[in-house]
């Protein structure tokens, strides 16, 4: 029996591979299928959009052509076209597409949130007066200070006289116009 040197364990083939740098991420076949199915559903959502909504989503020319073709096709051909769109989406970064689609879906919710913020700002304008006017001017520099102050004065008079809040509504409309012009 021959005696092996002390460092014979260091010479094992394949031992020199660094495990930290070359970490392999194993993905199951079912996870790949779930991801593919989800991208196919995303493609179907995009196909169901109208032309105006489709223009707001960042799509390259090939994908746009495939989507427009799927909108014209019916029945079994449509299913195959949706699979093709899902395959095309797997080869692209879909995050900007998802964000644009979410923005389209949540437009109503965003408007409701904006209206609540504008209502709160209107109420602060009526209660605080000039301090809140400065905040409005910092948000929207093109706002008319004189018109805003006039509306606030009228709203305070209406509130004290228990009259309908006509000026308060006008303040809200003015703030909404400022917010819409900003977009």
Curated annotation (Swiss-Prot):
It holds the Pfam family DarP. Keywords: Cytoplasm, Ribosome biogenesis, RNA-binding, rRNA-binding. InterPro entries: DarP, DarP_sf. GO terms for molecular function: ribosome binding; rRNA binding. The keyword DNA repair does not apply. GO terms for cellular component: cytosol. It is found in: Cytoplasm. Coiled coil: none annotated. CDD domains: YjgA-like. GO terms for biological process: assembly of large subunit precursor of preribosome. Belongs to the DarP family. Member of a network of 50S ribosomal subunit biogenesis factors which assembles along the 30S-50S interface, preventing incorrect 23S rRNA structures from forming. Promotes peptidyl transferase center (PTC) maturation. This is Dual-action ribosomal maturation protein DarP. It comes from Citrobacter koseri (strain ATCC BAA-895 / CDC 4225-83 / SGSC4696).
């Amino acid at each position: 029996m021959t005696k092996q040197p002390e460092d014979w364990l260091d010479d094992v083939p394949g031992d020199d591979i660094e495990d930290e740098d070359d970490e392999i991420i194993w993905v199951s076949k079912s996870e790949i299928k779930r991801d593919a199915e989800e991208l196919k559903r995303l493609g179907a959502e995009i196909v169901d959009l109208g032309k105006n909504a489709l223009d707001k989503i960042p799509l390259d020319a090939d994908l746009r052509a495939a989507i427009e073709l799927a909108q014209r096709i019916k029945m079994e051909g449509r299913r195959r076209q949706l699979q093709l769109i899902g395959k095309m989406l797997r080869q692209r970064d879909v995050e900007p597409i998802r964000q644009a689609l979410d923005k389209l879906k949540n437009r109503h919710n965003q408007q409701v949130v904006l209206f609540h913020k504008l209502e709160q700002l209107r109420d602060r304008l009526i209660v605080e007066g000039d301090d809140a006017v400065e905040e409005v001017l910092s948000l929207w520099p093109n706002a008319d200070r004189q018109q805003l102050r006039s509306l606030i004065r009228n709203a305070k008079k209406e509130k004290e006289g228990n009259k309908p809040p006509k000026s308060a509504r006008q303040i809200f409309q003015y703030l909404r116009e400022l917010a819409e012009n900003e977009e």
